[in-house]
């Protein structure tokens, strides 16, 4: 009886591992590596340009990206780029007014990536933690980086393209974006 229970537990554990590995390989796509990416003239042009932010319309910081999104319902928007490492490499393209906003997040783990939309707000309501978020489906995406791995403090150069369906039914729309980005890994 104990051997039979042990076999069942072992089968459940192995089945779970196979399922998790399969889901990782299906959902997380491979990152393309282009070692010459950092030599592109667009990155040198970023150093000459200033990026306006919510707090400074003149722009005091050097431009970090030219990523922009177009969708069925709005004209293009320019995004800010933030790069963090904890334990996955997280690249966030964000637009907002300081109180609420959103954008797209690219999580990279061992040369595989996953794209997802995200949003934030300072108007938190009771039971917001139960909200699973808006429906989305990544129709197409591509991420190109200049190196295989990064540590905190490293410079990162990259390019991304994405096509995401957000919502469904009459509220469905397609958002498409692409652009180069650079920065330091925080």
Predicted segments with their positions:
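C-terminal or internal capping secondary-structure element at the end of a domain, subdomain, or sheet
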Residues: 146-186
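Targeting-peptide/extracellular-domain and disordered-appendage signature
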Residues: 23-26, 58-60
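Surface-exposed helix/loop patches within compact recognition domains
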Residues: 53-152
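Short, Lys/Arg-rich N-terminal segment immediately upstream of the first membrane anchor
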Residues: 1-6
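Hydrophobic membrane-insertion alpha-helices, especially the h-region
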Residues: 7-24
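Ser/Thr/Pro/Gly-rich low-complexity linker/stalk segments immediately outside membranes or between
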Residues: 24-42
């Amino acid at each position: 009886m104990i051997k039979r229970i042990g076999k069942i537990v072992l089968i459940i554990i192995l089945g779970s591992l196979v399922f998790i590995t399969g889901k990782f390989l299906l959902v997380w796509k491979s990152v393309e590596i282009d070692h010459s990416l950092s030599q592109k003239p667009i990155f040198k042009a970023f150093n000459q340009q200033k990026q306006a932010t919510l707090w400074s319309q003149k722009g005091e910081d050097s431009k970090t990206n030219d990523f922009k999104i177009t969708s069925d319902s709005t004209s293009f928007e320019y995004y800010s780029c933030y790069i963090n490492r904890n334990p996955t490499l997280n690249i966030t393209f964000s637009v907002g007014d300081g109180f609420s906003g959103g954008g797209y997040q690219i999580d990279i783990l061992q040369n595989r990536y996953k794209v997802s939309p995200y949003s934030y707000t300072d108007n938190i309501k009771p039971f917001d933690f139960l909200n699973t978020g808006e429906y989305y489906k990544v129709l197409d995406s591509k991420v190109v980086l200049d190196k295989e791995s990064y540590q905190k403090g490293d410079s990162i150069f990259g390019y991304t393209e994405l096509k995401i369906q957000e919502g469904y039914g009459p509220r469905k729309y397609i958002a498409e974006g692409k652009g180069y980005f650079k920065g330091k890994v925080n």
